[in-house]
Amino acid sequence: MLDTPSNRPALPAEIARRRTFAIISHPDAGKTTLTEKFLLFGGAIQMAGQVRAKGEARRTRSDFMAMEKDRGISVSASAMSFDFMNKGTNFRFNLVDTPGHSDFSEDTYRTLTAVDAAVMVIDGAKGVESQTQKLFEVCRMRDLPILTFCNKMDRESRDVFEIIDEIQENLAIDVTPASWPIGVGRDFIGCYDILRDRLELMDRADRNKVSESIAIEGLDDPKLAEHVPAALLEKLREDLEMVRELMPPLDAALMAEGSL
């Protein structure tokens, strides 16, 4: 059957539902592993791989070259697509996993000319690193909207406020948290979704499962105490009070122009 205008999906609608974004980071911040999680929760794969998987353990799909598998690094940019339903719209996400090592940064620079936005991954223990800063500047030149993902919070990490201060100082950009970790290291149990007032709890037994999501009525909701230990809950409330007092609210227009 010929692909004619009459049987082809409406072009404007197809364009409107598509989003293309790149993931950028310093080497070993967890960029490719995050890519796997996007694919998993987007329904594109059944089990997330690990960059440093040993033996016959499942490895990542985006690192497909022999060198990438052997060394646990991304050498070239790889593009993957998955659908995700949100508020009645079936969005098509085109995800581009980029090389983190400076030796292969030319491929990353070219990739960033073709995306709508970027997800910047930061190691919670190391903060803003050199290659992250270089890639951020490339995004800034294109006025790309940037979402920052602070990774490895289930390991010993720096204080979140310290990381935010470093982002604002080193990258000269305002920061508005959209979610907040509950505990760090061994005490990490999940995140509080600030924008939607939800608890996103981590499944410690199987991290390939979507975590439990619980709707709550603000930080005074009694349901919080049912799921969050008292010490962590007190710390969460103190942290979010500071966030709301000291940091700007989310401004979609500023974010879209790459200023937030």
What are these regions (language model features)?
Residues 2-29, 124-260:
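P-loop NTPase catalytic nucleotide-binding module
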Residues 2-122, 128, 177, 231-235:
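P-loop NTPase switch module centered on the Walker A-proximal segment
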